């Protein structure tokens, strides 16, 4: 339903019963979009940019929201800085020229919160503006803030040189992995859809929905076993990958030594909480092997590592990095 798409990201002042923040409408899949916009010539195409959606709105003062947070003063992702701090580092907007009844939607690209596309320069893009009272999209230019490139508009602009959806999909599938694809709009910007680049999605899936870099690398190293792919696209993670691998090995070494001391030499040790279960799991392996009449079986460092690798990532992370 249209009202569901239009409700995406809105913030309501219940006291005054008014919308104080709007956002981009939700995306339709391409079939739904084509049901709404039957004429190819009525479709507007823009470049799709990779970054963080930031909405600027006024409620007693100018405030910022993201897709998942109404308060960027506390919200973070990947960086130790809040979204507001990252925004303010590159903000050059003259707030005096802005309409307090509008929401201004921006895309933030910052080296500290890189998603997939390479970020060499921290930058803001003005995506669109919305009248919070009427819900209409408003055509506004904000000085010194770029907009995404317009690639197709009626028969006036056709930078991509595409004449139908099939041609656009073929072009999208051949884009480099750094390019997300293309955004399609109706002329009134009421409806939008996206043609996604599969090469971009492949890289996105390596890091999707994970802001904890240590967790991401731990999973990549020992569960997904795709660390080479991860570092191919994110070479800046190399130092952290070495650190996480060292932390894993140090934990395994300590666990093996504790096992020898506790279970082989029968020395009492007041175990730290993050070693109690793992010691039991190691000893259970020993007992299982002995039950098979494998009387020469001994627990080695490699056995310990294999046990750790079989834990799910969340538990493995919790014992290597206890709070």
Regions found by a protein language model. Give the residues of each.
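Core nucleotide-handling region used for phosphoryl-transfer chemistry
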Residues: 1-323
């Amino acid at each position: 339903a249209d009202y569901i798409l239009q409700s995406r990201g809105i913030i309501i002042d219940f006291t005054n019963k008014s919308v104080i923040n709007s956002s981009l409408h939700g995306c339709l899949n391409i079939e739904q979009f084509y049901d709404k916009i039957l004429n190819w010539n009525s479709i507007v195409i823009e470049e799709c940019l990779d970054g963080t959606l930031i909405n600027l709105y006024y409620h007693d003062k100018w405030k910022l929201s993201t897709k998942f947070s109404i308060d960027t003063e506390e919200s973070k992702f990947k960086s130790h800085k809040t979204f507001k701090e990252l925004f303010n580092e590159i903000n050059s907007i003259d707030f005096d020229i802005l309409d307090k009844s509008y929401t201004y939607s921006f895309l933030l690209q910052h080296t500290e919160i890189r998603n997939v596309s390479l970020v060499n320069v921290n930058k803001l893009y003005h995506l669109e503006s919305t009248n919070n009272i009427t819900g209409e999209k408003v055509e506004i230019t904000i000085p010194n803030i770029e907009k995404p490139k317009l690639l197709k508009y009626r028969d006036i602009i056709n930078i991509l040189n595409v004449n139908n959806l099939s041609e656009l999909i073929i072009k999208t599938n051949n884009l480099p992995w750094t390019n997300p694809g293309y955004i399609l709009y109706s002329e009134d910007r009421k409806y939008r859809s996206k043609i996604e680049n599969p090469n971009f999605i492949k890289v996105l899936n390596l890091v999707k929905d994970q802001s904890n870099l240590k967790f991401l690398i731990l999973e990549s190293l020992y569960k997904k076993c795709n660390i080479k792919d991860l570092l191919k696209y994110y070479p800046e993670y190399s130092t952290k990958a070495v650190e996480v691998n060292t932390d894993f090995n140090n934990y395994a070494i300590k666990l093996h030594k504790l096992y020898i001391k506790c279970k082989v030499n029968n020395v009492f040790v007041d175990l730290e909480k993050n070693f109690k279960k793992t010691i039991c799991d190691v000893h259970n392996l020993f007992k299982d092997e002995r039950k098979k009449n494998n009387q020469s079986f001994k627990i080695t460092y490699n056995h310990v590592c294999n046990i750790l690798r079989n834990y799910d990532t969340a538990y493995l992370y919790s014992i290597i990095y206890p709070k």
